[in-house]
A protein has these predicted regions:
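Electrostatic cytochrome c docking/interface patches
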Residues: 1-23
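Short helix-capping and inter-helix turn/linker motifs at the boundaries of alpha-helical repeat units
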Residues: 7-8, 40-41, 100
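The canonical Cys-X-X-Cys-His
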Residues: 16, 24-35, 62, 79, ...
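Gly/Gly-Pro-rich "capping" loops immediately C-terminal to redox-active cysteine motifs
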Residues: 19, 33-67, 78-92
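Substrate-binding/catalytic groove segments of enzymes
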Residues: 72-77
């Protein structure tokens, strides 16, 4: 579990909410429903609803799931590691060695998810 923040700057929940909804960044809504974003279209059903996620997972768990979901769930999870260099199959060569999100974006998402109680 990753207890310590990835950056020295505290996460910003408002920025995390934007990343969560942004189809070109976190794109969390593609797989997860979230009642806090009822105004957004097309909530996914692949992953669990994130309503009340802060009541189910501690901060360190949320950070670990975002960094590399396979460290918490099984290797078969379809959730990508957003701050991991571990890649799956059929990844474009120009993307190897790059993370999906930056460390501060992970911290912003953690701050936002911690508000979903």
């Amino acid at each position: 579990m990753i207890e310590k923040p990835l950056t020295d700057t505290p996460g910003d929940a408002a920025s995390g909410k934007k990343i969560f909804a942004n189809r070109k960044q976190g794109n969390c809504l593609a797989c997860h429903a979230n009642s806090d974003m009822a105004d957004q279209l097309f909530h996914g059903e692949v992953g669990p609803s994130l309503d009340g996620v802060a009541s189910r997972w501690k901060e360190g768990h949320l950070r670990t799931i975002l960094v590399n979901a396979k460290a918490v769930f099984s290797k078969e999870t379809v959730m990508p590691g957003f701050y991991s260099l571990e890649v799956g199959e059929n990844v474009r060569k120009d993307l190897i060695g790059k993370t999906i999100l930056e460390a501060q974006q992970i911290e912003d998402l953690v701050a936002y998810l911690q508000q979903l109680k």
